[in-house]
Every structure is written in C-alpha cells, then in structure tokens.
C-alpha cells in the first residue's frame, strides 16, 4: 500500500459514495485507475465493505451508551459474540484488553430499553459484570473499521 492508496482510503472514509471520477481527481488519477485501486484494496481485504452512517436519534434510538462487559467464567467469547450480534440495539462490539472483556456501543430508544438490554446480557448473555456510560455527544466519527 502506497501514499496514493492511503489518500484513496481517506477520501472513501469521508465519502463512501464518491464517484470514481471524483475520487481520481482528488488523488491525481484517472477514474479507471482509481477504480482499479479500489478493486485491488477490496480484493486484498483492506476495504472490507461500504456502510451507511446512521443518525440513531433520527432513527428513533436517541440514547447511545458504551457498555464495558466482563464475561462470566462459564461463558465463551464465541457464545457472547453470537448472542450480541442478534441484539438490535448493539451497533458495535469490540474485544478489549484490561479489566473488561468487551465494549459494546448500543443505541436504545430510551432508558427502559437500555435496562432491558443490560438485564438480558446478565441473564442470557453470559455476562458477569457491566459498566455503562451514556454518550452525551459524539465529537466525530471516522469511516467504518
């Protein structure tokens, strides 16, 4: 991956719907050359997909929270990941180092839905402990990772 590939990635993270013509112009390539580079980056697994950035508040999910999760000794990572992938409010789950095992980003309709989610995780999700923080605002978001 060279400097032009990094420029292409930056442009795509800012606007995943940019045309190849505009992308090429932004990085000093023809539309065809830009398209070839994007295809190669996808083939090589550097670009794993294109997603829409959703305003959860406009979608009726105004309460965004970060939940640190420590799994119960009896639970496995695979079981937890499979269970949380089914839960609509969970928008992101990352396996982390430190005192907790995972951090979840969730978008809930209200505190009642957040409470139900936390109870479900502890009852059926193999979770021993959680630490939850409500997001006041998002300073910025980069492209999907």
Give the predicted meaning of each segment:
Residues 1-145:
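A compositional/biophysical signature of low hydrophobicity enriched in polar/charged and small residues
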């Amino acid at each position: 991956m060279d400097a032009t590939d990094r420029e292409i990635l930056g442009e795509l993270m800012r606007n995943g719907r940019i045309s190849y013509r505009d992308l090429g112009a932004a990085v000093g390539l023809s539309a065809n050359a830009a398209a070839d580079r994007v295809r190669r980056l996808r083939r090589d697994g550097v670009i794993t997909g294109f997603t829409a950035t959703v305003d959860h508040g406009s979608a009726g999910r105004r309460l965004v929270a970060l939940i640190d999760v420590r799994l119960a000794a009896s639970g496995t990572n695979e079981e937890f990941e499979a269970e949380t992938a089914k839960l609509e409010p969970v928008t992101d789950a990352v396996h982390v180092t430190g005192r907790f095992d995972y951090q979840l980003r969730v978008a809930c309709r209200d505190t009642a839905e957040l409470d139900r989610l936390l109870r479900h995780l502890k009852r059926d999700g193999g979770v021993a402990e959680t630490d939850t923080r409500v997001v006041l605002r998002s300073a910025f978001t980069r492209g999907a990772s």
